[in-house]
Amino acid sequence: MSFLASPRFLIGLAADQLLPHQCLLCGKFCVDRGVCAACWAGARPISAPLCDRCGRPLPHALPDQLCGQCWRTPPPLAAIRAGFVYNAFSRALILRFKHADGLYLTPVLGQFLARHFAALHQPGNLVVPIPLHRHRYLARRYNQSAELARWLAPVDEFAPAILLRQHHNKSQAGLNRAQRQKNVAGVFTVAPKSRPTLSGRPVILIDDVMTTGATLTAATNCLLAAGSGPVYGLVLARVL
């Protein structure tokens, strides 16, 4: 029996058409699957004008489209894009996604990132999630960044085994910029068997939240040192 003809799929399809949808945040009924209008009012999607390099929103369009920080110290990433500003709205969705068996949120969150992914995507891309250490993976049972990457990427570009986290570093929460950089120093490595696949190819790194950019920077430096092409970052939300 094909999946499309399975009882579970057919029951789910019927329920999707006949039953009212519930908001993923407040649980109230909403017109479509996703977030109701009242909760969506708290969202801060990121859109142009923004810095071409780091993706920070700009107050108005600039001739060179670079923020002051990227003029002074450009990041190693070719570009970074985020779906939302990190606030109460995006925090609630991301925490549910990460810590409450929230894999059912993957399509909704993936759709929020789809336009940014399309803008960054180019032929020959590898789509690489920021990896979890195996201890954290066993505790959570899934890597939320890998699930987003799987949803966004063409099958032949999804590359979850290229980048490895070789040390179980402590959480970045509550650390300042310098502490975050130190905390992720030397954390990542490229799997030796993956180096030929990686060589010269552009990479889109997928993560959930960008605070200072320390994690994306450490991962990017690791990939570039292993011979990748340009590296781009895509996150659900970023702290401003």
For the regions a protein language model found, what residue spans apply to each?
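Glycine-rich phosphate/pyrophosphate-handling loop used in enzymes and phosphotransfer proteins
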Residues: M1-L240
